Amino acid sequence: MIKYAAGYVGTLLVLLVIDLIWLGVIAKPLYSNGIGHLMAEQPNLWAAAAFYLIYPIGLIYFSVAPRNGALSWSDTLLAAAVFGFIAYATYDLSNLATLKGWPTHLAFIDIVWGTVLSTLAAAGGKAAFDWTAAQALR
């Protein structure tokens, strides 16, 4: 059980750190220019916390630890990329379909970002999961 907790924490930490840098620094002007008219002055912290607590569960379940963590690194990273692509495409394409003025270029950038972010976060989770599993065998 501890290896799953370690995988979750590893996934969560990488997800949080990298996404906060992306959202807070790198892509902030991109989002402000593209959807600034829709953005709240302050983020809804409970909703953000819920996302960051729930999303790693999906990455753990589908990419880091299916079949008790037996996936290879390449299979883990591919599964994480597919999971991220589908999750972010669902969000962005739904917004593109239903919200007036949602920028097409921003949707595609965000889908690519979600794919990359999910892959990196799962790498952190797999490293923590595998390391903890190896320690348990000692």
Label every PLM stretch briefly.
Residues 1-113, 117-138:
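Juxtamembrane/disordered regions of integral membrane proteins
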